């Protein structure tokens, strides 16, 4: 356990940030999962809507520093590519 006052405060803020980041990452996984389920079902309209929502969440997570902007771009590109394959 930390003895320095600033470090005790830092432990608390780190814990809050960790919980917030965990929640955001969970939302991202859910959004990407919904895209993949729409793709496997072959429903292009639902997949396009899900990609839009997932892209928005990925961009927001990247802007908040939860994930790196390149990782967000890679994930957006990958799911968009999969949706484009749907006939």
From Swiss-Prot:
Disulfide bridge partners, by residue number: none
GO biological process: translation
Top-level division of the source organism's lineage: Bacteria
Cellular component annotations (GO), alphabetically ordered: cytosol; small ribosomal subunit
Region of interest called Disordered, as start-end residue ranges on this chain: 1-22
Molecular function terms, GO-annotated: small ribosomal subunit rRNA binding; structural constituent of ribosome
Alphabetical UniProt keywords: Ribonucleoprotein, Ribosomal protein, RNA-binding, rRNA-binding
Gene3D superfamilies: Ribosomal protein S20
UniProt keyword annotation of RNA-binding present: yes
Cited Pfam families: Ribosomal_S20p
UniProt xrefs under InterPro entries: Ribosomal_bS20 (IPR002583), Ribosomal_bS20_sf (IPR036510)
Keyword Ribonucleoprotein (UniProt): yes
Family the UniProt entry places it in: Belongs to the bacterial ribosomal protein bS20 family.
Function as written in the Swiss-Prot or TrEMBL entry: Binds directly to 16S ribosomal RNA.
Protein's recorded name: Small ribosomal subunit protein bS20
Lineage: Bacteria, Bacillati, Actinomycetota, Actinomycetes, Micrococcales
Encoding gene, per UniProt annotation: rpsT
